[in-house]
């Protein structure tokens, strides 16, 4: 097998391929140009977008040329894959703003040389399509019967599929044809939910141009606990630090189930397989900390990752820098008078209601400093502060806040 494909396979990336042997032979013959698409349907990428981007970087490191297609045209329709309802329709101004934000995030992650990765926006060729010509030249090659066998459409037929969304596969296939013509693209990569669209695109190129092109998909990641990768109780795990703080981002990875640590180190870091195996021999917690640090470093930068690491160590290990923790300011007057612990946990955002706080205390999951809170009616005052005038409050093993008084500020 071609070394680049072998690397992806060894790390757990490959789910399906149109013809793995043929693709391997083509890659052995020399560098090829491939593409991955992302629709700008939001202001930030989330972790669910990133597995194909890790694969892109592996392929580029092996000497191949990557194209990131920003779906400024297709996003006006919305991909029905994996969706139970029609997406909100967005205008061009919003899509342009989202596209700019996404490109900035990818620039940071890829840190690339533009000779190896380039961007295109399918709005450039989709926005001015003549509908009649498109139906004759592209639509004639699609079978509705075959399209309805794809999982994305089968699921939506039960809840309602608009004709607008039904066109999405034709447009994505036309993207593959256009990129093949303009940039000699020979491979499309993406998540396994894109398999039907990718196969349809490869088939269109073969029918219209008589060329053989390829498709490669990656697994849709779920955690060992059944949770969809990148999903939290608060929603998606976004890369934008204004939506998900780097500390919370770090903690998400630090709390990876034991069974997933090796798999995620191989998929979401660029550590060698040998280094991954070596770190696992040092203990699962050491491996989890390295996973959290590496992913945070790749997404937010080394300095930010260091701060998140020190904050986590301060919260849970008794060392590190407490200043790196999420911080909430209380007035000195509040602590002089005292505040009920249930009110405190709600005020700092560790609980949504007093009932939640009482339940947390009853279950033994509330901590002020190093002390577990046992009394639902406890009052927290200045005596709870450490010598530096701060105190760490914690809900369970994952959520923590550093409290400071206004005097310190």
Swiss-Prot record:
Chain span(s) of sequence motif 'KMSKS' region: 228-232
Entry EC no(s): 6.1.1.1
The entry's keywords: Aminoacyl-tRNA synthetase, ATP-binding, Cytoplasm, Ligase, Nucleotide-binding, Protein biosynthesis, RNA-binding
Subcellular location: Cytoplasm
Organism taxonomic ancestry: Bacteria, Pseudomonadati, Spirochaetota, Spirochaetia, Spirochaetales
Binding site for L-tyrosine: 35, 168, 172
Residues holding ATP: 231
Family, similarity comment: Belongs to the class-I aminoacyl-tRNA synthetase family. TyrS type 1 subfamily.
GO cellular component: cytosol
Subunit field text: Homodimer.
HAMAP family reported in the protein's UniProt record: Tyr_tRNA_synth_type1
Species for this entry: Treponema pallidum (strain Nichols)
Known role: Catalyzes the attachment of tyrosine to tRNA(Tyr) in a two-step reaction: tyrosine is first activated by ATP to form Tyr-AMP and then transferred to the acceptor end of tRNA(Tyr).
Transmembrane spans: none
Domain S4 RNA-binding, residue spans: 339-404
Gene3D superfamilies in UniProt: HUPs (3.40.50.620), RNA-binding S4 domain (3.10.290.10), Tyrosyl-Transfer RNA Synthetase (1.10.240.10)
Name recorded for this polypeptide: Tyrosine--tRNA ligase
SUPFAM superfamilies: Alpha-L RNA-binding motif, Nucleotidylyl transferase
CDD domains (UniProt xref): TyrRS_core (cd00805)
């Amino acid at each position: 097998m071609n070394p680049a494909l072998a690397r992806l396979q060894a790390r757990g990336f490959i789910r399906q391929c149109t013809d793995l042997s043929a693709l391997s032979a083509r890659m052995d013959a020399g560098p090829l140009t491939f593409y991955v698409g992302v629709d700008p349907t939001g202001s930030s990428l989330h972790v669910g977008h990133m597995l194909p981007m890790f694969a892109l970087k592996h392929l580029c490191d092996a000497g191949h040329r990557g194209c990131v297609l920003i779906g400024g045209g297709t996003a006006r329709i919305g991909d029905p894959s994996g969706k139970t309802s029609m997406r909100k329709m967005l205008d061009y101004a919003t899509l342009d703003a989202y596209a700019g934000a996404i490109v900035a995030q990818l620039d940071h992650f890829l840190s690339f040389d533009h000779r190896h990765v380039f961007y295109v926006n399918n709005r450039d060729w989709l926005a001015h399509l003549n509908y009649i010509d498109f139906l004759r030249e592209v639509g004639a090659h699609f079978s509705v019967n075959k399209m309805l066998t794809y999982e994305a459409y089968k699921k939506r037929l039960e809840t309602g599929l608009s004709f607008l969304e039904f066109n999405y596969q034709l447009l994505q296939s036309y993207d593959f044809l256009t990129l093949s013509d303009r940039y000699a693209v020979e491979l499309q990569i993406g998540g396994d939910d894109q398999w039907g669209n990718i196969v349809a695109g490869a088939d269109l190129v073969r029918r219209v141009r008589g060329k053989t092109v390829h498709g490669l998909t990656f697994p849709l990641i779920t955690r060992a606990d059944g949770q969809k990768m990148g999903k939290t109780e608060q929603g998606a795990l976004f890369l934008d630090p204004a939506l998900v703080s780097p500390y919370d981002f770090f903690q998400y990875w630090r709390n990876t189930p034991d069974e997933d640590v090796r798999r995620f180190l191989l998929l979401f870091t660029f550590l060698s397989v040998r280094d991954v195996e070596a770190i696992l021999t040092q203990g699962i917690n050491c491996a989890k900390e390295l996973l959290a640090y590496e992913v945070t470093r790749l997404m937010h930068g080394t300095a930010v990752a260091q701060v998140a690491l020190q904050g986590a160590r301060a919260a849970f290990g008794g060392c590190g820098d407490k200043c790196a923790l999420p911080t909430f300011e209380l007035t000195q007057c509040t602590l002089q008078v005292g505040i009920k612990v249930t009110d405190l946990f709600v005020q700092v955002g560790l609980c949504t209601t007093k009932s939640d706080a009482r339940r947390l205390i009853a279950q033994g999951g509330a901590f002020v400093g190093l002390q577990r809170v046992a009394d639902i009616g406890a009052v927290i005052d200045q005596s709870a502060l450490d010598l530096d005038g701060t105190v760490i409050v914690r809900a369970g093993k994952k959520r923590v806040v550093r409290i400071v008084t206004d005097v310190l500020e």
